[in-house]
Curated annotation (Swiss-Prot):
This is Capsular polysaccharide biosynthesis protein CpsC. GO terms for cellular component: plasma membrane. It comes from the Bacteria. Pathway: Capsule biogenesis; capsule polysaccharide biosynthesis. The lineage of its organism: Bacteria, Bacillati, Bacillota, Bacilli, Lactobacillales. PANTHER family: FERRIC ENTEROBACTIN TRANSPORT PROTEIN FEPE, TYROSINE-PROTEIN KINASE.
């Protein structure tokens, strides 16, 4: 029972220490939040994302005019292959050559993100760049080159463009609000951890209860601080 009370008193003291230094914690959090805001706004260069989407159906040109269940099922399995084709070395090299980009195929691949929504045959191609017009230009060129490559390799009848890439109006990164919030919370957590750490390392006797807990003896009396009584 005594040990349980000691734990409760210790926890209370830790909370009290945090509350006592709440102004310092708030100031540090505001400084780190402002630093994150300034870094995201003035140092990090914004990037823009343009996305184009294609629809591919595994349909053979033959006597059957419509789509069969087998065609649809095969198309679902092949979309992962399409993603690999889009990011293949041949496709990237052709895009770099056509647009005369000052990039290597590997550098271009780092700007590209290919996603395939679950249970669909739709492929989304997103390109990031610091210039919004350049991002859309690369995305549309990549779509055209990849479409021809997909048709020649997989023998599908057609690759349909669902959506052309357009220049983005607002940047996709950095997320200034999120970064500022992370900076603020990091300041709060970091300062709180330091305060708690210093409090736990402080072995000085500050209260009469500390003597009882340390020596396991009942305190008979306390000498008053005469300076505070004046």
């Amino acid at each position: 029972m005594k040990e349980q009370n000691t734990i409760e008193i210790d926890v209370f003291q830790l909370v009290k220490s945090l509350w006592k230094r709440k102004l310092m914690i708030l100031i540090v959090a505001l400084v780190t939040g402002a630093g994150a805001f300034a870094y995201s706004t003035f140092i990090v260069k914004p990037e823009y994302t343009s996305t184009t989407r294609i629809y591919v159906v595994n349909r053979n040109q033959g006597d059957k005019p419509g789509l069969t269940n087998q065609d649809l099922q095969a198309g679902t399995y092949l979309v992962k292959d399409y993603r690999e084709i889009i990011l293949s070395q041949d496709v990237l090299e052709e895009v770099v050559s056509d647009l005369k980009l000052d990039l290597t195929p590997k550098g271009l691949a780092n700007k590209i993100k290919v996603t395939v929504p679950v249970d669909t045959r739709i492929v989304s191609i997103s390109v990031n760049d610091r210039v919004p017009e350049e991002a859309s230009r690369i995305a549309n060129s990549l779509r055209e080159v990849a479409a021809q490559k997909i048709i020649s390799i997989t023998r599908v009848s057609d690759v349909t463009t669902l959506e052309e890439a357009r220049p983005a109006i607002s940047p996709s990164s950095p997320n200034i609000k999120r970064n500022t919030l992370i900076g603020f919370l990091a300041g709060v957590i970091g300062t709180s951890v330091i305060v708690l750490h210093l409090e736990l390392l402080d072995t000085r006797v500050k209260r009469p209860e500390d003597i009882e807990n340390t020596l396991q003896m009942t305190l008979l009396g306390v000498v008053p601080n005469l300076g505070k009584l004046k």
